[in-house]
């Protein structure tokens, strides 16, 4: 058998030798642009955006405090007592439990119960206040059922909550190994896991909650996460702070991480008129970036920057490396009250379009009601954080569901990204910690100036050209006399004196500005009257 096998094999070889076929593989032709790019890579390597600040050192973890907490302390007596009270309360209402399990978090313990067959979930849900009474505890929340599990959850606050330090969150492997474009470490979940999300995938974030519940600390946690993870060449912040004291602490990092308008002294924007110009400037930047992406045939900023690093885009054609720009607004309601539509329109444009070109919005407000955040803006903020609020209505306004009214405050928050709610204890960043990070970054060599946004000149300068004197209102002369006599350029004055509607009074004021009777818009102040009585 072996011999016959060898003979067959020899015959096969002979046949193969008789018909020798050469196979020629065709190579894809290299385009001129690819050839130039490959030659440049051979000579200089890939483009490195961090090269200009190559000696820049990322902040040290020693700048963050530890608060002396090594882990969660388990109080067995408290767990047993709570379990007995939950079982007893449910038994009083003839609700039997076949299984109970406790998961201990930093501030809250989750008791997962499996009710006996035939028990209606709504019956357990209606006993929320009774369970709270029996446990003598605030902030009890019932999750019925827990998504993805066949259990009902009862969240009970711990008697001795653990402080979640920013250091413990940033040193976690989940954050350190996060392969995300813009990773944000928000804090720890009920199961004591570090909660890390990608701002690019959000793509905008809405934070809301009552005064003193942790919004500003939450903003600091977001900014600290990005400063610890991203080089100044990769991310820029536009900080809007109507309160003037919350974000002022970041002024030291102006030449590293901040972006501003040309010819403005301070990078942190506190004046409402400058906010309008900055937002419109960001819209111009957005349009410019979309034009660059269109010319480079890319769909988003990640593809574009990768192409630029591979030297496939020529800087002579206007191409350059695009950093992510993050707009942070600390108290949005104040802007809407003072500037209204002038702020709303650019914010809505940015919320709808800016995600693909790397401009992301983080807006904090006390209560995002319809008059503060319109439906168009809110629809573009699927990622929302709710700190403690006063009522169920406020909770529904933020999250479109209840729950935020049952939080216990001090950084206890609910996070949603269009699906189920996740309860998180926000990482605590103290003011001295933020100051030391800002000083560490600010003490290093930075760029010659802050990242400059495109110049924007307000439209009010062109109003004299736009309005034709023949189209003036029939009450223009009478209105001008009222304004000059009162020496107060306000539309509300015309509404009262001449019994006009708001729109007509506003149009007359614009016509007066064009005629040189009153000065330009100055936010919440009345316009200056340029003609004396």
Q: For the regions a protein language model found, what residue spans apply to each?
A:
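Low-complexity, intrinsically disordered P/S/T-rich segments
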Residues: 1-206, 395, 533
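Terminal-proximal interaction/regulatory segments of ATP-powered molecular machines
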Residues: 96, 458-533
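Interdomain boundary/hinge elements
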Residues: 142, 388, 392, 448-456
